[in-house]
Every structure is written in structure tokens, then in C-alpha cells.
């Protein structure tokens, strides 16, 4: 788990005296880093007793064209990613990634690590 609270040190390096301990709601989690492979999901419990589906691996995408028609197709590879240029080489799927499909290039509109599904729109 990753703690997302304040640093224990000031910008000059001095230690800050602790007024209280850590809280569970201050914990974060590691990124899912969804890869292209056979579909693998993981259920995570969240605040309020809700569930979140982490998509760890996926090789299919729901692609919508300009006319609004949606079809399920396979993902070949990642050709662009504005989040991190190194994700292209590692074939990591994030929101905004440009992927190559048999229908053409598509841009991912969902958040695979939090939604549990990959949706995309076809680029012209």
C-alpha cells in the first residue's frame, strides 16, 4: 500500500513532529498497469462497501465508430500514450492511449485500472 499523506520532512530536510498517526483513508494503492494478454481481473473493496474492478490484463476492446456503432475487437498493440511514453513499449493500456486494432487506430476512453473494461473510439 502507498501512503498518500504529508511527508515527514520539510523542504529543507528537517523532521516534522508527528501530531497523529496514519489513517486508513490516507492509504492509496499501486497502479494496475493493464497489459495486453488474456483477460485477468481483480476485485477490490473500496470505501462505503463498494467494489472496484481492476483490469490487470486484457486483449479485447469495445470500439465505437463515428456513426455510434460499437463492436468488440482485439487489441494488437499500443501505438501512442500521452500519460507516459515508456508505456508504449511496455504495451500498458491507460485512458488516452492510442491502440492498434483490426478496425484501425482507436483511442481508449475508459479507465481500465478502475472500470474493469476497455472502451475506445475509432480515430479517423
How does the language model describe each region?
Residues 1-124:
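Ribosome-associated RNA-binding proteins
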